[in-house]
């Protein structure tokens, strides 16, 4: 086999060292890190901040007061209302040039701080799961033997494990997209409230998406915990076939 492809010995030693490091890290992740992390997330789910039953407690002040209605008279110093109003608006437009923006009378409109605090705790957990799954996936892939006829039952278990790890990675990445969509959707609604402060439905919609995001964040944490449980259980149950997919494994591994 060595005669078919010439490999630099120094490079080969570095690759072998990399394989050994990945193997050591992955086995430690499955044996120790996964069970510790699932217990940690299970404890996190029991914290008071994630067990609010009255969702009105997570509502935030919009900080956008409803302005007083404008009273228009039929005449003003000999000018009728519409003409005078138009003249005043024309004068203002001439005095102030540039891009028009909505004015926030009470300063910057902040995000829902309670949800932001939860999100800032959840995002590192999502990233951590993606990174650890990637390491374990690489380990299992490196254990897959070369393709040949014979008993490939163990190989199919390896491939199913890799597929499950890849699915977990994709689902975890989708959680990050979900968080981004929440911020974008809320920002658009707040802009609508600034433009149409008298429309109550916009204000109610903001509280609705805040409540929905709170429920979604709790579900995300629950899913992260469950994924650690599932991966730990699946790999431990099939560890023999994952590490030795064939009886003649010593001769068929790369």
UniProtKB/Swiss-Prot annotation:
Pfam families per UniProt: PA28_C, PA28_N
Record-listed N6-acetyllysine modification sites: 195
SUPFAM superfamilies for this protein: Proteasome activator (SSF47216)
PTM comment, free text: Phosphorylated by MAP3K3. Phosphorylation at Ser-247 promotes its association with CCAR2. Acetylation at the major site Lys-195 is important for oligomerization and ability to degrade its target substrates. Deacetylated by SIRT1.
Annotated GO CC locations: cytoplasm; nucleoplasm; proteasome activator complex
Keywords attached to this entry: Acetylation, Apoptosis, Cell cycle, Cytoplasm, Nucleus, Phosphoprotein, Proteasome
MF-aspect GO terms: endopeptidase activator activity; MDM2/MDM4 family protein binding; p53 binding
Compartment(s) where it occurs, according to its Swiss-Prot or TrEMBL record: Nucleus; Cytoplasm
Modified residues (N-acetylalanine): 2
Modified residues annotated as Phosphoserine in this record: 17, 24, 247
Main localization (coarse): nucleus
Domain notes: The C-terminal sequences affect heptamer stability and proteasome affinity.
Subunit structure: Homoheptamer; the stability of the heptamer is essential for the specific activation of the trypsine-like subunit and inhibition of the chymotrypsin-like and postglutamyl-preferring (PGPH) subunits of the proteasome. Interacts with p53/TP53, MDM2 and MAP3K3. Associates with the proteasome. Interacts with CCAR2. Interacts with PSME3IP1 (via C-terminus); the interaction is direct and promotes the association of PSME3 with the 20S proteasome. Interacts with COIL; the interaction is inhibited by PSME3IP1.
Family in the record: Belongs to the PA28 family.
PANTHER family named in the record: PROTEASOME ACTIVATOR COMPLEX SUBUNIT 3, PROTEASOME REGULATOR PA28
Summary of the function given for this chain in its UniProt record: Subunit of the 11S REG-gamma (also called PA28-gamma) proteasome regulator, a doughnut-shaped homoheptamer which associates with the proteasome. 11S REG-gamma activates the trypsin-like catalytic subunit of the proteasome but inhibits the chymotrypsin-like and postglutamyl-preferring (PGPH) subunits. Facilitates the MDM2-p53/TP53 interaction which promotes ubiquitination- and MDM2-dependent proteasomal degradation of p53/TP53, limiting its accumulation and resulting in inhibited apoptosis after DNA damage. May also be involved in cell cycle regulation.
Protein name: Proteasome activator complex subunit 3
Lineage of producing organism: Eukaryota, Metazoa, Chordata, Craniata, Vertebrata
Gene this protein is translated from: PSME3
């Amino acid at each position: 086999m060595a005669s078919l492809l010439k490999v630099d010995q120094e490079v080969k030693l570095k690759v072998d060292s990399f394989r050994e490091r990945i193997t050591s890290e992955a086995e430690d992740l499955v044996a120790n890190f996964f069970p510790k992390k699932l217990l940690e997330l299970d404890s996190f789910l029991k914290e008071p901040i994630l067990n609010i039953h009255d969702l009105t407690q997570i509502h935030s002040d919009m900080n956008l007061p409803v302005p007083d209605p404008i009273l228009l008279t039929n005449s003003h110093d000999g000018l009728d209302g519409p003409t005078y109003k138009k003249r005043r608006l024309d004068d203002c437009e001439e005095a102030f040039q540039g891009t028009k923006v909505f004015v926030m009378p009470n300063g910057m409109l902040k995000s829902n701080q309670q949800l932001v605090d939860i999100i800032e705790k959840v995002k590192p957990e999502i990233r951590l799961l993606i990174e650890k799954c990637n390491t374990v996936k690489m380990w299992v892939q490196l254990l897959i033997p070369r393709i040949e006829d014979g008993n490939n039952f163990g190989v199919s278990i390896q491939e199913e494990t890799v597929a499950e790890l890849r699915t977990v990675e994709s689902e975890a990445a989708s959680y990050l997209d979900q968080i981004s969509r929440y911020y974008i959707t809320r920002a658009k609604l707040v802009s609508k409230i600034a433009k149409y402060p008298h429309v109550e439905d916009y204000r109610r919609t903001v509280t609705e998406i805040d409540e929905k995001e709170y429920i979604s964040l709790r579900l995300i944490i629950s899913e992260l915990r469950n994924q650690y449980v599932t991966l730990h259980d699946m790999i431990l149950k099939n560890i023999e076939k994952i590490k030795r997919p064939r009886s003649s494994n010593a001769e068929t591994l790369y």
